[in-house]
């Protein structure tokens, strides 16, 4: 099994969620570590989350990427964890992310050693939730990834990297390694990312909201994208809400109506921190806050972002 930063893999190995016989370290592959911003942004998959969050060009031209990377876990883990690793990070569930003893005592679940989803016993698929902070932003910005295998190489949109199953949540083939992330030039766009978690550090997202808009000179929305994380096995695009925003200005009434549409695709279950009805309601609130930030409303809980136009 390949390993880069190992900030998620190693704890999972200690809990016997993964039991690889061999680990292949990738950290010495310097060619997969660089960050270049010549028109589009190219991120080497081994660039650390700290490198991404503090890179001057990323902060200036793709500030939502910098923010999402900077909200992952804690500073020591961001110093080790990689952007590629966060895109590929394992799905999470209260019944899965436990010690071996705990999981054995309840009979295991289908994600590891069992055959029943303990969140939804009647389901034929696993409902462990997507726990990546950076993927919603990458999808909102139309990013792509390069996947390399011994005999092939392909480039796919980030949104095609994920599937509707908490076990087989990546479309990446076992022999493929994610080597680069490519983000289009988004000058003229406003973008943001908001994260909901119990504590202000360390915790995985129980909700993430990425939003990006391109405004006309009169302030009307020309294009919009809203992506939710932490509410399903993969990031969820709120397409109906994005379509609703087109041609409208980001005034409070429009924002509230769009947020009321955007939260409907969220499908949280009782498999993460805090109650799922509350997390569903918070999706509406956090979308409104994200759109409000793009519309120029103050966000006292986060440092304001600046967008290059």
Predicted regions and their residues:
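C-terminal structural segment of proteins
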Residues: 1-309
């Amino acid at each position: 099994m390949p390993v880069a930063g190992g900030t998620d893999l190693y704890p999972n190995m200690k809990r016997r969620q993964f039991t690889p016989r061999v680990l292949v370290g990738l950290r010495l592959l310097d060619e997969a570590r660089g960050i270049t911003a010549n028109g589009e942004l190219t991120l080497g998959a081994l660039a650390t989350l700290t490198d991404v969050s503090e890179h001057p060009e990323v902060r200036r031209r793709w500030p939502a990427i910098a923010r999402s990377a900077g909200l992952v876990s804690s500073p020591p883990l961001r110093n080790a964890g990689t952007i590629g690793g966060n895109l590929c990070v394992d799905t999470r569930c209260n019944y899965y992310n436990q010690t071996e003893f705990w999981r054995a005592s309840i009979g295991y679940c289908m994600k590891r050693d069992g055959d029943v989803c303990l969140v939804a016993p009647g389901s034929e698929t696993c409902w462990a939730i997507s726990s990546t902070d950076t993927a919603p932003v990458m999808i909102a910005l139309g990013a792509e990834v390069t996947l390399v295998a011994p005999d092939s190489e392909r480039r796919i949109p980030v949104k095609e990297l994920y599937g509707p199953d908490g076990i087989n949540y990546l479309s990446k083939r076992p022999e493929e390694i994610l080597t680069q992330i490519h983000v289009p030039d988004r000058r003229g766009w406003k973008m943001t990312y908001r994260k909901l978690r119990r504590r202000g550090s360390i915790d995985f997202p129980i909700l993430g909201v990425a939003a990006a808009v391109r405004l006309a000179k009169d302030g009307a929305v020309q294009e919009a994208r809203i992506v939710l994380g932490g509410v399903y096995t993969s990031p969820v695009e709120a397409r109906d809400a994005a379509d609703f925003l087109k041609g409208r200005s980001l005034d409070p009434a429009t924002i509230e109506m769009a947020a009321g549409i955007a939260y409907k695709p969220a499908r949280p279950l009782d498999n993460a921190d805090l109650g799922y009805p509350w997390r569903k309601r918070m999706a509406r609130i956090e979308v409104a806050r994200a759109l409000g930030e793009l519309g120029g409303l103050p966000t006292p809980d986060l440092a304001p972002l600046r967008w290059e136009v």
